[in-house]
Every structure is written in structure tokens, then in C-alpha cells.
Amino acid sequence: MAEAKTVPVLFLNDSIVLPGMVVPIELDDAARAAVDAARASESGELLIAPRLEDRYPAYGVLASIVQIGRLPNGDAAAVVRGERRAHIGSGTSGPGAALWVQVEEVTDPEPTDETKKLAGEYKKLLLAMLQRRDAWQIVDMVNKITDPSALADTAGYASYLTGTQKRELLETTDVDRRLSLLIGWTGDHLAETEVNDKIAEDVRTGMEKQQKEFLLRQQLAAIRKELGELDDNGDGSSDDYRARIEQADLPEKVREAALREVGKLERASDQSPEGGWIRTWLDTVLDLPWNVRTEDSTDLARAREILDTDHHGLSDVKDRIVEYLAVRGAAPQRGMAVVGGRGSGAVMVLAGPPGVGKTSLGESVARALDRKFVRVALGGVRDEAEIRGHRRTYVGALPGRIVRAIGEAGSMNPVVLLDEIDKVGSDYRGDPAAALLEVLDPAQNHTFRDHYLDLDLDLSDVVFLVTANVIENIPSALLDRMELVEIDGYTADDKLAIAQGFLLPRQRERGGLTSDEVTVTEAALRKIAADYTREPGVRQFERLLAKAMRKAATKLADHPQAAPITIDEPDLVEYLGRPRFLPESAERTAVPGVATGLAVTGLGGDVLYIEANSTEGEPGLQLTGQLGDVMKESAQIAMSYVRAHAKQLGVDPEALNRRIHIHVPAGAVPKDGPSAGVTMVTALVSMATGRKVRGDVGMTGEVTLNGRVLPIGGVKQKLLAAQRAGLSTVFIPQRNQPDLDDVPADVLDALDVRPMTDVADIIAAALEPAHEASTAAAA
């Protein structure tokens, strides 16, 4: 730095002056005093520095006075030129009213190669930005600057830099650092400018295109009018819709509503989005089959043949469809109208575990009726508008799934399958299940009104088939409107027949095989059903058959001489691996305190093991296994009954004055319901007496404090599960005996089903004799 010298100082509030800049300064009292002092001084210079709120400025610019005059508004001003940076020292005294400070000039070192490289990079960015703005005079001026420091200080004129950035440039004495800052700031601004210019160009191009399209449409309309294709009241599109409405077979109210919308279309501006909304609505209305109905087939023999060909078993559903056809055929033949004046529709809910054929049954029903078939998946639907549609005030509004299904079917009397209705949810957008109340109510659905159409749609001719896994998840008001048909799963004989008649031929064909090349014995099929799947349906059964066919196809491809292949029971380990399910009831109940119960889940019936144990400690009852409130109460009732009737049951009361623990595996699965009462009593008595429960026995029923066995639900599913689990004796409540009429005969033949009224009788029959327990204990 040079020697210190004393100069008058002028602090500016809003401006930053860098070396090389020529700027006007309005002369207020302080500025005039500083300018006068500078002109009177020997050097003729003054220091211009920014006024900072938080600190005293460290650097300023020594400036010379170029001219004194007036601004266009008449105010006095001085034009100054920044000459050199200076470091500001302490204040001092001087002549006149001006403030004086001591300063030291900052001298720039000779530029290095790195400095020149940075200067070249910055100049390239600066010239690119100036050329984009067509500032060619400034381009010429910048090209003439060779000093890197002077080039960097031209940024004082840059409008895209903030006051803080310019002040940082003023205080940065290192030229390399100054150029690096400017390269970053200018590069960012240039990129932002390019994006803004691109957006502006896109907007301008879009506006020009829109104006061009508008002009061409006006010219096209004028040409068509001259050719006589239009009258003075239409615009082409509206007349086209009028003609389509007149030709369409529409109900009178629908025709009137459509013509009103055409009138709105004629009055709508071409630039208004309303025109597009009206056209979409008119297209939707005209595409619906308002008066189109297919003729039902009333051939009962043909219907039975179709249903039996596609599905094995399911007699309840098949009988209901045949009854429906019989009524449909008999009423017109006798000149009788449908009761109540409603249409020919029906609403049935097919409830059962997965894989029993509920969804595929819908297509078979449609074929049997000679009707169109449409499937509507409801799983995961949470928006009421999915059912009723969106109101036309919303952008992108569409009709609901019911209206779209009718349009897709092309008739007003299709078979509509509403799949997985128990998976419907609800949130802030409404409850789809509540919207289905009107759809599935035969007394109301002849005037179903979709929000989008806002017209009455007659759904009374539609056959609605609804599928569900868990009936309890369907709202009671909705379930009340439907005819319930429960499909409880297949027996072992059913699965064998399905595999031989449906699954095996299909998977053999998919594997490119024939019956001459690969066969599966009946024993192998029964083994797969019993030890590899153990499911109510046949989905996993079919997957395993597909796996076996793939392995057989691979074997034949590697060794063609291996044909024909016969897969028998001993060969299953080679094709399917080891069995996944083995009879375990005998193993589970091999110790006292374990009883086998029966339960119903969303996947059908299943066995439920209840374990009881006792330990030293304060008397009490501990329950584990994620039990629900009802099941916890059943455990309390069972414990109270055993305590009260200990003598009759042969239980030592002291054995119950311990810490009793009841556990229901699996612990990660929530469980609830009253039907485990008798099983809990049996497990407690077995634990207290040391007598094991017979391994081939299962039981179900609710128990009272007096030991009465009350009826429960799901008898058919539970007996099917007992057969799959390899049980031979099942105890059920006496009042559930009428439910045995619904159980397949082969299941009843395989099981010894004993209706009981008193839990004491169940205990006497289910527990091993006392002398056997004593012998086992001694051994």
C-alpha cells in the first residue's frame, strides 16, 4: 500500500462506486461540503464509501470530480469518477464542514497467468450476456479492457448484482478472488436468463399458435357457411350433436336434457373450456345403451350344463341362478308382469374364502343367462365419486364405475360383478359403501342418479353379483339389501374332481404337454390337497400342479425317452419338495393342557390349539395370543366354571390355586369370538387333572357359567377344516345340529360329529381315561 494521506469522505446510502465507474451524485449538504473540500484540496480527490449500519467501512474509492451541474429534475449534482481503491483509516480534522479521514491507496500487483485465465473466462461470460441483450457498444468497450482488475471493476454497472455483492467486490482487494466471485455470479445469472428467455419464447409461440388456430377456425366456419353446410344459428358441432340426438333411441327426459346442453354449446365461446365439458358429457350420454337390452336365455338345461362345465360344486349358487331363469321364463309365458313393476335384475353376494371360484363364477352366470359381463374391482376404493361419479363442476370430471360398466357392456341388463366389496374403505372423500346402498337396492336402483350424468339411470335389469371374503366387513345396511350365498370351500373329493376335470388339463396344456406324456395319479392328487396345500380353495393346488408340469416338461426336454411320465404319491418329493402340512393334532395334544378347537377366519375354517399351564405364584389368570375382548371373557367364564365344578370334574381345587396361563398360538394373529369356550374348559381340566386330550378330537362351542354349550356360527367351514386337519371326532353344540344339513355328505361320513349340550359330557369323552394318564406319568 502507498503512504497514508488525508482526504474528505462522502458516505453513500444506496450506491456502491467501484474504480473506473463514472456516476452522478446528488449534492445535499454533506455531499456539497465534501465536494467543496476536495476541490479546494491539493489532490482534488475525495473518498466515496458505503454507509454501513453494523460497522465502519474498511474500504472505499478515491474519486475525482469530473463535473458539477444539475440533474434533469433541477437538483444540483456532481459527476465523479472512481479512480483507485483505498483502505480507510482513522478520522482526522480538516478545513471546512466536510468529514476527513486518513486513507492508504491499494495497488494491484502484476497479473499472473492464473489471473489472466480467470479474466478471460469472466470476459467470455460477460460478452455472452451482453450479446444476448444486444448491447454491442458495451461489447466493444469490454473488448478494449486488458487490465484484469479494471475488467472486474466494470461489474459495478451490473444491474443483476445486489448491493451486498458489489460491496464484497469493493472490499476484495485480491484480483483473482474478485474474478472468481464474478464468474460464479455471472454464470448463474446467464443460466437464469436463458431459462427466462426460453419461457418467454414458448409463451409467445403458444399465443401465436392459438391466434392462428382461432383465425383458421373462423375462416373454416365462414367457408362451410358459404357452402351451405351450416345455418346462421349453428357452428357445425352443435348441429352434429342435434342430429345424433334425434337419431338415438333415448328416453324422453334424457333427450330433453341433451338438447338443453346442445343449446348451451351453441351459446358457448370457442375459447371457453365449457364447450369441451359439454361435448364430453354429450358423448357420454349418447354412448350409453339407454334402451338396449339383450334377450335372456330361459333354457334351464343349457344353463345347468354351462354352470356345471365351468365350476364343480357350488350347488347353492347354481340352484339360485336356475331358479332365477325359471321365474324369468314362467312369468311372461303366463302373461304376468314382474311384481312391483321393477326390472329383471337380482343382487347376490357370494361370500367365502379366496380361491373357491367366486369371481370366475360371474362369467359363467353371464354365459348361462346370455347376458354381457362386466367386472368392477372395488378393492381399495375409498372415494364415493368412484361409484357415483364426479360433479361436472370439477375439472376432469368422469362418470362413476357403475355408469362406465353399463357403457362398457353395451346393454342395460348385463351381469355386473362387484369384486371384493369387503375391501372398500372410507376417508374424507366419503364412503363408497354408502353410495352402493342405492345401486344394490332393488327398490331404488331403477332411478339411480350418477353425479356426472345428473340423469336417472335404470339399473333394475342388471344382475349384480358381489364377492366378499369376510361378511363382517360389509356394512349391515348394505348386506341387508343383498341375497347372501355362502361358499364355504371344497372338500377333499371336490378338490380331486376339480383337479382332474379342470386344473390338471389346463396346466398340462399350458406346459405344452398331453395326457399321453404326463399323468398324475389320484393318490398323488389327494396327497397334494391334504399335505401340500390345506386351503379352502384351489389356487395353491393349481400352482403346485403348474410346478409339477414345468418339471415334467423340463425332464422330457432333457430325456425324451422318459415319456410317458406318471407322477404318483412317492414321486411328489421330487416334483414338489417335502410336504408343508402334516397332521399335528396328536403331537400338539401329547401333553396335558392342550386342546384342539375350531375357528373361522377370512380364509375359511381352521384348527385352533389352546394351551393351558400353571406355575407357582399368586393365583390368577394370564392370557396371551392377541385375544379379543370376547375371547378374554370366554377364558374368564371357563376358569370360573372349572373352579365352581372342580369336584364334579375330578379336579383338585389346590391345582387351581396357582398362576394359570392360557395361550392361543399363533401369537402374531389377532383372535376373537365366543366359540373357543368349550376348548378352554377342556384345556384347563386337562392341565389340572394331568389327563391328555385325545389327539383325534376337535371341538367348538360357547360355554356358560353353568356349563351349557351354546350355538356358534361357521359349522360347515369348521367341519371342513377338521377333515383337512385329519381329525376324526368333532363336538358341536346341540342347537347347531340343523347346520349339518349344509355339510357335504362325504365330510359327515369322514367325521364322527357329536352334538352336545353340556361341557362336562365333552370333557368326559375328549380326555383320556385317568388310569392311562397315571400310567403315562409313571413311565
UniProtKB/Swiss-Prot annotation:
Domain Lon proteolytic: 589-769
GO biological process: cellular response to heat; protein quality control for misfolded or incompletely synthesized proteins
Coiled coil, from the record: none
Catalytic activity: Hydrolysis of proteins in presence of ATP
Effect of S675 to A/T: Loss of activity
Organism domain of life: Bacteria
Enzyme Commission number: 3.4.21.53
Keywords carried by this UniProt record: ATP-binding, Cytoplasm, Hydrolase, Nucleotide-binding, Protease, Serine protease, Stress response
Molecular function terms, GO-annotated: ATP binding; ATP hydrolysis activity; ATP-dependent peptidase activity; sequence-specific DNA binding; serine-type endopeptidase activity
Enzyme category, top tier: hydrolase
SUPFAM superfamilies in UniProt: P-loop containing nucleoside triphosphate hydrolases, PUA domain-like, Ribosomal protein S5 domain 2-like
Catalytic site: S675, K718
Gene Ontology cellular component terms for the protein in this record: cytoplasm
Signal sequence annotation: none
Quaternary structure (record): Homohexamer. Organized in a ring with a central cavity. Oligomerization is Mg(2+)-dependent.
Family: Belongs to the peptidase S16 family.
UniProt-listed NCBIfam families: lon (TIGR00763)
Protein name, per record: Lon protease
Originating gene: lon
